[in-house]
């Protein structure tokens, strides 16, 4: 699922999305954007501020479209093209009153406007980002940061919290800023829509690596959401010979069958689930 553009209304009471079969709302809006350049020959600060529109949580199951100034603060500046709807995002949306003022969105792709200090990037490059940084800013000088382990920074701070300065907003915005070291250039054979799914597919890859799936392994995946489907895709890539997905939601089960990522799809709440799994695996149980 991906957002693409903003609705005309001033607030959202629901989430409009694009998915592969083109359902959902499909209106894209082009909004004039005003850059203000304050450069003095320093290319890392070529763009310092921009007026843009962004979606902010304004209550339970409610977004509000606002306009504000985004400062580059020396970071890379990106134009967001696609952003995924993560389960974390929907949790924030349902509890929007608690998270009022937060700009979410961390599964995204975009186009570089200003690369900041990343010399490997240039304006116009298509990128995806290391998404943990949308929720927290690493300090860059603690022991964890110096080891490259930014997730465990001991001095991290949260962005756009409780209506504070826009700072580094999530990707439910026209533009966002990102730490230059957290951006990955998309290869030519990966579309921006596919690039927005880099984060959930990285989660699936990690799960399969940790599970040490090998060629000809038979794999059972508990849960068939985007992460479960990602695990199934990676299990196949790693050579699994048979993949079974167990899922509670009947709609998700049909989606999994439609994408043909698993050999067997079973209802997680089936009274005979244990026997089904034994039959699929060809195993037997003795007491």
Positions of PLM-derived features:
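Polybasic, lysine-rich low-complexity intrinsically disordered segments
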Residues: 10-11, 15, 21-23, 39
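Short, Lys/Arg-enriched N-terminal segments with co-localized hydrophobic residues
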Residues: 34-51
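Glycine-rich beta-strand-centered segment in the early N-terminal region that forms part
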Residues: 71-83, 96-146, 187-189
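NAD(P)H dinucleotide-binding glycine-rich loop of Rossmann-like/cofactor-binding domains
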Residues: 134-222
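Mid-domain Rossmann-like dinucleotide-binding core that forms the NAD(H)/NADP(H) cofactor-binding site
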Residues: 188-273
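Short amphipathic alpha-helix with an adjacent loop that forms part of the alpha/beta core around
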Residues: 272-284
């Amino acid at each position: 699922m991906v957002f693409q553009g903003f609705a005309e209304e001033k607030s959202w009471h629901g989430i409009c999305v694009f998915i592969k079969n083109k359902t959902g709302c499909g209106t894209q809006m082009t909004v004039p954007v005003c850059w203000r350049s304050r450069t003095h020959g320093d290319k890392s600060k070529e763009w310092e501020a921009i007026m843009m529109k962004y979606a902010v949580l304004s209550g339970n199951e409610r977004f509000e479209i606002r306009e504000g100034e985004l400062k580059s603060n020396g970071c890379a500046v990106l134009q967001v093209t696609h952003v995924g709807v993560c389960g974390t995002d929907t949790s924030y949306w349902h509890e929007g009153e608690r998270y009022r003022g937060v700009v979410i969105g961390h599964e995204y792709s975009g186009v570089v406007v200003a690369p900041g200090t990343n010399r490997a990037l240039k304006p116009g490059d298509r990128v995806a980002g290391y998404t943990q940084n949308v929720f927290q800013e690493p300090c860059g000088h603690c022991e964890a940061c110096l080891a490259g382990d930014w997730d465990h920074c001991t001095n991290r701070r949260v962005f756009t919290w409780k209506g504070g300065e826009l700072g580094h907003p999530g990707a439910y915005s026209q533009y966002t800023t990102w730490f230059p070291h957290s951006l990955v250039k998309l290869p030519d054979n990966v579309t921006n829509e596919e690039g927005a799914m880099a984060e959930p597919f990285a989660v699936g890859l990690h799960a399969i690596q940790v599970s040490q799936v090998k060629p000809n392994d038979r794999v059972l995946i508990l849960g068939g959401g985007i992460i479960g489907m990602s695990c199934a895709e990676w299990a196949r890539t790693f050579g699994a010979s048979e993949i079974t997905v167990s899922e509670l939601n009947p709609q998700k089960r049909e989606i999994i069958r439609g994408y043909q990522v698993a050999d067997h799809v079973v209802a997680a709440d089936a009274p005979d689930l244990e026997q089904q799994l034994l039959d699929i695996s060809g195993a037997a149980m003795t007491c």
